[in-house]
């Protein structure tokens, strides 16, 4: 049966992703809804709630907010030692947050919008100037603070397909991490997977390929992505759907480029014309702020396996008050003050650091900014479950809608079969044809020894069947009236179906 792949817990501090995956499991196992029952019968859900479980355990049970990494020991600073300089809880509040310290040569100044924040220093800023660090000490006495955390290889930069050794966190080679390799082997062994969602946080953004400037999407696939993205925005109520490469984070932009979908202030969704003069491939404009992500899941699943791959950045903390397409940290602070009772940002407090002297410790806590607090968890999960179910409904699904018989005399019949794809997604994405990896829809007849198939081509092939589309195939057979013939149709991503008929005049 056609399948969708769901994974969470790829980034260890994004624990809402695991909860959302489990929310889907719960819905599928407990719902009596007729639509859910139909999905259980006609589709397959492969759900991996937590790709890096030891990372999320670190998040839940220690003071650390782990980075996007496996916990395989890694020498970040190339000093021959592994994971020797992590952040620490210095002030005993059971959190490892941030530190800021006055420094005449510092690169930061207090933000005039809100002095709890720092911004980059400009040439004419009068000071005082600051440096900022994660909370902790210089454990290895190399002059750097907390530069060698646990682990260091990012599984979402370790995928084959657009992998680069220069990408931070890429690892020694594509698929080097055991957790990711196990997932890749499973996906490779299950060619019925035609769609995926990789669950992440935060930002309230629906992401799609490409993640790098070298990759171009065929227009047919881009149109499909845009249509499903718009539906996803309506379901999740998020503000932006974009390619990873165009998502101008962290510096931000209005996110109003070609192929992006953005929710306007009045709630309507505006789509930017993605097509470049009717070309066969979508061409985006390179930009110095673009967020290239080599070795990411979306490009790997899409290009290597022909999977319509989305990543959902679950949860957005704060409101876009100036309608510039992003939620700034000053807007988040205002939201925390007015809506969250200041539960998410810890005020800066003085501390005597054993190496830096007088510092301030404070900043964003683990929960609230990147993951919703408990009162907001259920609503966030349910909206994302609906998005995943919507994508599952869109999977290609083959059926035999009609069989016509034409008697030609002398016990010869022409059988004409209409094959329907009732899913929104085609049986093959356009990228599969570009890469010469496409698999046709195959149909053939099963007959008894009393029936003979007269066609030279016993198996009929159709390159692809578009979403909500249909195609016809026909055979000539010889057999007596009442003989049974079974028509079989198969595509790895569209499923298998058959229909038995009796020859009749």
Regions found by a protein language model. Name each.
Residues 17-61:
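Short helix-loop-beta-strand segments that form the rim/entrance of peptidase-like active sites
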Residues 42-167, 215, 302, 324, ...:
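Surface-exposed loop and adjacent secondary-structure segments within mature catalytic domains
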Residues 44-54, 60, 66-67, 148-408, ...:
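Metallocarboxypeptidase
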Residues 460-469:
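Short proline/glycine- and polar residue-rich coil/turn motifs
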Residues 473-481:
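Short, hydrophobic beta-strand segments
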Residues 483-492:
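Short, aromatic- and glycine-rich surface loops/edge beta-strands on solvent-exposed regions
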């Amino acid at each position: 049966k056609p399948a969708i792949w769901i994974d969470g817990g790829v980034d260890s501090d994004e624990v809402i992703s695991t909860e959302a995956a489990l929310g889907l499991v719960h819905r599928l196992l407990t719902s009596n809804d007729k639509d859910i029952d139909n999905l259980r019968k006609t589709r397959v859900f492969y759900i991996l709630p937590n790709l890096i479980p030891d990372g999320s355990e670190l998040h839940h049970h220690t003071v650390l907010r782990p980075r996007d990494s496996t916990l395989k020991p890694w020498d970040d600073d190339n000093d021959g030692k592994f994971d020797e300089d992590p952040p620490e809880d210095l002030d005993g509040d059971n959190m490892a947050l941030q530190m800021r310290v006055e420094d005449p040569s510092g690169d930061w100044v207090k933000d005039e919008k809100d002095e709890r924040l720092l911004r980059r220093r400009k040439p004419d800023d009068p000071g005082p100037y600051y440096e900022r660090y994660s909370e902790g000490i210089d454990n290895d006495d190399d002059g750097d603070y907390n530069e060698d955390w646990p682990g260091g290889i990012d599984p979402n930069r370790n995928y084959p397909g657009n992998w680069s050794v220069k990408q931070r966190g890429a690892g020694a080679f594509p698929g080097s991490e055991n957790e990711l390799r196990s997932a890749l082997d499973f996906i490779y062994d299950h060619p019925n997977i035609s769609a995926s969602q990789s669950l992440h946080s935060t930002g309230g953004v629906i992401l799609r390929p490409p993640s790098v400037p070298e990759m171009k999407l065929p227009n047919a696939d881009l149109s499909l992505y845009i249509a499903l993205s718009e539906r996803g925005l309506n379901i999740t109520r998020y503000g932006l759907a974009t390619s990873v490469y165009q998502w101008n984070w962290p510096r931000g932009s209005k996110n109003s480029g070609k192929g992006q979908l953005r929710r306007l202030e009045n709630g309507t969704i505006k789509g930017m014309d993605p097509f470049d003069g009717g070309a066969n491939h979508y061409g985006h404009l390179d930009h110095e702020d673009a967020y290239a992500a080599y070795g990411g899941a979306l490009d790997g699943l899409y290009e290597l396996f022909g999977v319509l791959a989305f990543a959902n950045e679950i949860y957005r903390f704060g409101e876009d008050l100036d309608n510039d397409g992003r939620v700034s940290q000053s807007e988040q602070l205002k939201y925390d003050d007015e809506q969250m009772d200041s539960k998410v940002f810890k005020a800066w407090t003085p501390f005597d650091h054993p190496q830096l002297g007088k510092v301030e410790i404070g900043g964003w806590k683990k929960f609230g900014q990147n993951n919703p607090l408990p009162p907001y968890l259920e609503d966030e999960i349910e909206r994302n479950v609906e998005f995943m179910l919507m994508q599952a409904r869109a999977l290609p699904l083959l059926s035999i809608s009609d069989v016509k018989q034409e008697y030609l005399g002398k016990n010869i019949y022409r059988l004409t079969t209409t094959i329907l794809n009732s899913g929104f997604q085609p049986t093959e994405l356009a990228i599969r044809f570009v890469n010469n990896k496409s698999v046709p829809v195959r149909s053939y007849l099963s007959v008894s020894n009393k029936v003979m198939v007269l066609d030279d081509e016993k198996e009929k092939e159709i390159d692809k069947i578009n979403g909500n589309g249909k195609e016809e195939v026909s055979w000539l057979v010889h057999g007596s009236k009442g003989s049974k013939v079974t028509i079989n149709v198969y595509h790895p991503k569209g499923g298998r179906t058959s229909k038995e008929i009796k020859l009749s005049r």
